[in-house]
Every structure is written in structure tokens, then in C-alpha cells.
UniProtKB/Swiss-Prot annotation:
Protein family: Belongs to the class-I aminoacyl-tRNA synthetase family.
Chain positions of motif 'HIGH' region: 32-42
Pfam family, one: tRNA-synt_1e
Name assigned to this protein: Cysteine--tRNA ligase
GO biological process, one term: cysteinyl-tRNA aminoacylation
EC number: 6.1.1.16
Record organism: Burkholderia multivorans (strain ATCC 17616 / 249)
Cellular compartments annotated: Cytoplasm
Length: 465
């Protein structure tokens, strides 16, 4: 099997992946700020790094996968105050909702899922180290800030020059800062902060800045120098740039070897975002589409490419997934283990080892499906199911997928009992030689999105189309 090559944002190139410890991978991914339901952009991040950790394990690595939860920040505080509830009540509720969405999409839980509020002492410890090393200072307003210009390598991840950055572009100008580009490590508490929004520290009551949370959790749980850090493309700057400055400023060593960033989700060629009002929650999508269809829609686009969201693309994903499940219908896969020397498995592995090239890997699945359709071979069916399983796909019994309604509760879809009753009425019409009535029922079902297939021996199978 070829070596795994990963596009490293830091190097701006594909590199052969070499873990710090042979056979072990330590990976941190920036998770979700829990004050609302997860949207399609979150779904992409969740699925992408689920695929990454699945593939790393599939090729033999022992993986420690950490994905954090941000459960304290300004948006969370504002939402809790607006709702008249405690911060913990709000965040617990949306953490539960996030887990429900993850389960629907077939996301395997990370090995460790730390909440920011569980690591306040470690964050303060890192801030004190930065202060001792000359990178942090307490401003006149009580905030503790990071002095960006004192970190010589600032901008190495994003390629941005300090001299080219304008204050106010990503951070608001603040007279208390020594430099407008400095960012906050510890925010002094406000008089009207609700309960649970601040902690005691040597700098006074306050709460951590967003960036220090991930630095402290990553270094605490994975060590001060680890293998992979991932997240959405929008986090590359300033969040991940600031993580590097904090972590390396505190420890004096390289923070992360490989940086992975998934691309944006777009609607009509614009980035999907709350500010543009063009975003959809995972739950809204799952009201109309099966969760595995949504997962397939995400998986079939390369993780670094833009993902174009539309009903047309989701409908196409449903049709494509239906083709794969149809190939497995009426074929019982054999029970042998996956053999990486098999030609289809080799092509699949070569694609995944080429920076997780899922479009090519999925093309291999369709090649296999075509051969299964032609040969009805149990070994090929097993390979199709096993390889798709590495992507979190084709895990259901084919008829269960083919006979379900399109969404979680698609309005107007015939129930299974209604379909079976019509099939029974059609069979009765055929026995009575009323073929016109039998044809009418078949056409009626097809208009309702149900295709029939008469089998030898007189039985009839059906699937939704």
C-alpha cells in the first residue's frame, strides 16, 4: 500500500505523513460553539474529520482523536441572557442536540471531547507562561492580550504579513491594546455578566479568549507537540494562526506538524453563513433527506474543495446512493476479511492515501457496483460493502434503505402498509386477469415514487425512487 500523503496547509503542499511516534497519531480538531443547532457547515467538518480518523485507523494507526466543545464565549452568554436561562442549561441542551445530529450522520464520537470550561486552570497556566516569556501583558482595561509583533513567525500558517494586516479587518481596534492586532487571552469580567460567565484568576475575574481554549486543551490532552490539527478553512486565520503563536510562544517548540482544513459550503456560489442568511441546519436538511444521503453528499466532494449545497445536488446524491444499495440487493456478501491485495481495494486505498481523495474512492465503489450487478458475485458484494463501510456508508440492509421515505418525515409519502396493500390489490387483479387494473396500480405507485419489480415465482419487490 502506498504511503499516506496529506495536504499540509502549513507547507502549502502534499507531504508524506510521518507521525511523531511510529504507529500512533494524535489529532485535534476545532469543534462547535454550542449556542444553536448545527448547520451544514458544521456537518461538513464533522463528516470530514470522521473520515480522516476512520482512514487512519483502517491503515493501522492507533489514533487519539480530540475534538473540543466551546461552551463559553460572548455568543453563548448573549443567547443565554436572551433566553433567560443559565449558560450551562443552554450549552448542555445544544451539546445533546449536536450528539443527536452526529449519530444521525454516522459520526463516530472522538476519543476525547473536552469542554472549554473544564480546562480553565490549564488556560490560565498557559497565559502565565506567555506572560513570563514576554508575549502577554495586562492592558489598562483589565484584559490580558497577546503581543503579536513579539512572535517572529506570526503569519506562517496563513501567509499573512503583519504589515499588511489592517486593524478592524478581523479584530476591532482597542485603545487599551499596545497594538491593534494584539488579541485577547483573558477577558476581564463585566459587571452585568451572568452566573457561570467568569472565573477567578491572578488577573481578576474573567473568562478565556477563544484562541487560548484550543491551545490549552490540545497541549494538555495530546502533548505540546502533536501530529495533526484540523478545522474549517475559515479557522485558518486568525484562530489557528493565533493558536500557533500562543502554543509555540508558551512552549518554545513546534505545536503541530500537519494542518488540515476543509473547504467552505456554498449556496449559489456564496459561502454559507449566518450573516448572509443562507444557512440550513442539519435538522432542516434531515426533514427532507435521509441522513446517509446527506453524508454521501458531503463525502463525494474532496474535503478541500468547495461543497455546493442545493436540492439538485442532494437529489443526485440520493440517486447515486440508491444505485449502490440496489447493487447489493439479493446478493449475500461472503464473510471473508478485506484483502488489500484485491484490485478494487488497492485502487480505493491509493485514492484515500492521496490526501483522502474520496471522489476517486467513490468512483471505485461504482466500478464494484457495476461488476456486482453483472455477476451477482458474493466476494465483490463483500468488497463493496467493506470499502463503503470505511466511509461510513452502506451499513444498512439494502431493502431498509430502498424502501424508506426520502426524509425523516416526508409529507405525503405512502407508508409501507399502504404500499403493501396496493401491491396485494395488484396481485389480486392479476389473478383475476384484470391486467388493466394491475397496470393502473403499478402506474399509481410509480407516480407516488414507488417502483415495482416482479420476481420469478410471482412475488413483487418494491423500492422508492
Amino acid at each position: 500500500m502506498e504511503s499516506l500523503r496529506i495536504y499540509n496547509t502549513l507547507a502549502r503542499d502534499k507531504q508524506v505523513f510521518v507521525p511523531r511516534q511510529p504507529g500512533e497519531v494524535r489529532m485535534y480538531v476545532c469543534g462547535i460553539t454550542v449556542y444553536d443547532y448545527c448547520h451544514v457547515g458544521h456537518a461538513r467538518m464533522l463528516v470530514v474529520f470522521d473520515l480522516v480518523q476512520r482512514w487512519l485507523r483502517a491503515i493501522g494507526y492507533r489514533v487519539t482523536y480530540v475534538r473540543n466543545i466551546t461552551d463559553i464565549d460572548d455568543k453563548i452568554i448573549r443567547r443565554a441572557v436572551e433566553n433567560g436561562e443559565t449558560i450551562k442549561s443552554l450549552t448542555d441542551r445544544f451539546i445533546d442536540a449536536m450528539h443527536e445530529d452526529e449519530d444521525a450522520l454516522g459520526i463516530q464520537r472522538p476519543d476525547i471531547e473536552p469542554r472549554a470550561t473544564q480546562f480553565i486552570p490549564q488556560m490560565l497556566g498557559m497565559i502565565e507562561r506567555l506572560e513570563a516569556n514576554g508575549y502577554a501583558y495586562q492592558a489598562t482595561d483589565g484584559d490580558v492580550n497577546y503581543s503579536v509583533r513579539k512572535f517572529a513567525n506570526y503569519g506562517k500558517l496563513s501567509g499573512k504579513s503583519l504589515d499588511d494586516l489592517r486593524a478592524g479587518e478581523r479584530v476591532a481596534a482597542n485603545d487599551a491594546k499596545e497594538d491593534p492586532l494584539d488579541f485577547v487571552l483573558w477577558k476581564r469580567a463585566k459587571a452585568d455578566d451572568p452566573e457561570g460567565a467568569s472565573w477567578e484568576s491572578k488577573y481578576g475575574m474573567g473568562r478565556p479568549g477563544w484562541h487560548i481554549e484550543c491551545s490549552a486543551m490540545g497541549c494538555t490532552l495530546l502533548g505540546e507537540h502533536f501530529d495533526i490539527h484540523g478545522g474549517g478553512q475559515d479557522l485558518q486565520f486568525p484562530h489557528h494562526e493565533n493558536e500557533i503563536a500562543q502554543s509555540e510562544g508558551a512552549t518554545g517548540q513546534t505545536f503541530v506538524n500537519y494542518w488540515l482544513h476543509n473547504g467552505f459550503v456554498q449556496v449559489d456560489n456564496e459561502k454559507m453563513s449566518k450573516s448572509l442568511g443562507n444557512f440550513f441546519t442539519i435538522r432542516e436538511v434531515l426533514e427532507r433527506y435521509d441522513a446517509e444521503v446527506m453524508r454521501f453528499f458531503i463525502v463525494r466532494t474532496h474535503y478541500r474543495s468547495p461543497l455546493n449545497y442545493s436540492d439538485v445536488h442532494l437529489d443526485d446524491a440520493r440517486a447515486s446512493l440508491t444505485r449502490l444499495y440496489t447493487a447489493l440487493k439479493d446478493v449475500e456478501p461472503d464473510a471473508l476479511a478485506l484483502d488489500w491485495n484485491e484490485p478494487h481495494a488497492q485502487r480505493f486505498a491509493a485514492a484515500m492515501n492521496d490526501d483522502f481523495n474520496t471522489p476517486v474512492a467513490i468512483a471505485t465503489l461504482f466500478e464494484l457496483a457495476g461488476e456486482v450487478n453483472r455477476t451477482r458475485d458474493a466476494s465483490l458484494a463483500r468488497q463493496l460493502k467493506q470499502l463503503a463501510g470505511l466511509l461510513g456508508l452502506l451499513g444498512r440492509e439494502p431493502r431498509a434503505f430502498l424502501q424508506q421515505a426520502s426524509g425523516a418525515a416526508q409529507a405525503g409519502a405512502l407508508s409501507v402498509d399502504e404500499i403493501e396493500a396496493k401491491i396485494a390489490a395488484r396481485a389480486a387483479a392479476k389473478r383475476a386477469k384484470d391486467y388493466a387494473e394491475a397496470d393502473r396500480i403499478r402506474a399509481e405507485l410509480l407516480d407516488a415514487g414507488v417502483a415495482l419489480e416482479d420476481k420469478p415465482g410471482g412475488s413483487t419487490e418494491w423500492r422508492r425512487v
